[in-house]
């Protein structure tokens, strides 16, 4: 894992740790995913999704779920723009 990807994994885990205090798991996942979608550069988002697709080493459970959701939304959006 490159140092850049390690940094992204750490940031995703830190963000999910913050949202882990939500009483509902779905809210924690949504909060993490929304934060990444709003505040991360598109290149960073593509890198973390690619890392997840390669196995997602180091991603915590909430961060992994958030990146999976982000990847699903990105796939839906690109499918909509190409049709």
Language-model features: locations:
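Generic structural concept
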Residues: 9-12, 33, 67
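Surface/interface-facing alpha-helical segments and adjacent flexible terminal/loop regions used
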Residues: 6, 80-83
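Juxtamembrane/interface motifs at transmembrane-helix termini
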Residues: 47, 66-69, 81-82
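Generic N-terminal initiation segments characterized by hydrophobic and/or small/turn-forming residues
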Residues: 5, 56-59, 67
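C-terminal structural segments of small proteins and small subunits
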Residues: 61-76
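N-terminal acidic leader/helix
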Residues: 1-24
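Amphipathic, hydrophobic secondary-structure cores in small proteins
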Residues: 16-62
């Amino acid at each position: 894992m490159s140092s850049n990807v390690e940094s992204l994994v750490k940031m995703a885990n830190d963000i999910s740790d913050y949202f882990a205090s939500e009483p509902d798991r779905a809210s924690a996942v949504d909060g993490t995913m929304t934060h990444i979608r709003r505040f991360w550069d598109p290149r960073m988002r593509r890198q973390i999704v690619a890392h997840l697709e390669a196995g997602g080493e180091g991603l915590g459970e909430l961060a992994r779920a958030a990146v999976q959701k982000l990847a699903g939304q990105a796939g839906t959006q690109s499918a909509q723009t190409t049709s």
